[in-house]
């Protein structure tokens, strides 16, 4: 396990905060925050929660209830124009300036480079980027679409359900084959690639609805998941936002908030 380097955490941190009009309310405050972490308890924000707890970075967890549409507020769009979580504001960004970063993969790379942790060996950097983007452009989106068509879409769309479930299995198999004889996805150490994979593997039973243990056919992948999941930082990451009353009802308002493109506005 890699510790945050000396100089990243300490008295030099500015305890500045984004103005109230630039961020949703209901914040969980921590002492001298450096990273303002905007999240909802879903797989992509979970990756960032894991990094923050692994690296020991001071942070402030700021809930964004996507089921209520808080991600569409103009105040949040100044942080992520795409209206998605996760997003962060780093009050000590490059040159000491406040910096915003959005998209889970971009945030993982940014924080890993900032702290000099969980990047693996320099010679493995091309491999690290390749697997991060494999997850970002493949495993993650296909998993998300599998969830959508099994839980949120109208019933009877068997082609879509089968398409995305099969693609998830294919991505599982690619990773499983790659992990033969390896402890981690890249190089010899635990990196942000493993954290990124963990975010969606942790929801495998939801992604593969009806499967008791969907990782069992992929023993190397299951071993990786269990290795990451057993790390002490995972329990701390899971605890973030546990006490916040996120909306649980999947009503029409929630569907409009989560899938606004399905409800185009009609011009007057």
Describe these PLM feature segments.
Residues 78, 230, 239:
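Phosphate-coordinating loops and pocket residues in cytosolic domains that bind phosphorylated ligands
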Residues 120, 132-232, 236, 268:
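GST-like fold's C-terminal all-alpha helical module
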Residues 241-268:
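Acidic/histidine-enriched, glycine/proline-rich intrinsically disordered or flexible terminal extensions
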Residues 32-163, 176, 255, 266-268:
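GST-like domain detector, emphasizing the conserved glutathione-binding G-site
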Residues 65, 192, 241-242:
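Short, solvent-exposed turn/loop segments enriched in Gly/Ser/Thr/Pro and often Arg
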Residues 1-12:
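Extreme N-terminal basic, low-complexity initiation segments
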Residues 16-33:
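Short, Lys/Arg-enriched N-terminal segments with co-localized hydrophobic residues
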Residues 20, 102-103, 229:
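A conserved hydrophobic position in a structured secondary element of the catalytic/binding core
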């Amino acid at each position: 396990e890699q510790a945050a380097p000396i100089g990243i955490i300490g008295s030099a941190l500015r305890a500045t905060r984004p103005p109230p009009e630039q961020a949703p309310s209901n914040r969980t405050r921590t002492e001298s925050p450096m990273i303002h972490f905007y999240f909802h308890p879903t797989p992509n924000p979970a990756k960032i929660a894991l990094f923050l707890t692994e690296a020991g970075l001071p942070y402030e967890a700021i809930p964004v209830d996507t089921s209520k549409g808080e991600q569409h507020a103009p105040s949040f769009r100044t942080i992520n124009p795409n209206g998605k979580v996760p997003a962060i504001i780093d009050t000590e960004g490059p040159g000491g300036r406040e910096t915003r970063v959005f998209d889970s993969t971009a945030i993982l790379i940014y924080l890993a480079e900032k702290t000099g942790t969980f990047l693996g060996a320099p010679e493995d950097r091309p491999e690290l980027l390749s697997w991060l983007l494999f997850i970002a452009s493949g495993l993650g989106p296909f998993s998300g679409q599998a969830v959508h068509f099994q839980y949120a879409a109208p019933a009877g769309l068997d082609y879509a359900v089968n398409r995305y479930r099969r693609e998830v299995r294919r991505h599982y198999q690619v990773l499983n084959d790659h992990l033969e004889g390896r402890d981690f996805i890249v190089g010899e150490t635990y990196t942000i690639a493993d954290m990124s994979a963990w975010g969606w593997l942790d929801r495998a039973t939801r992604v593969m609805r009806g499967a008791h243990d969907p990782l069992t056919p992929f023993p190397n992948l299951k071993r990786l998941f269990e290795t990451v999941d057993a790390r002490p930082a995972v329990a701390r990451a899971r605890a973030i936002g546990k006490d916040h009353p996120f909306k649980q009802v999947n009503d029409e308002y929630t569907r409009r908030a989560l899938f606004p493109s399905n409800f185009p506005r009609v011009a007057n």
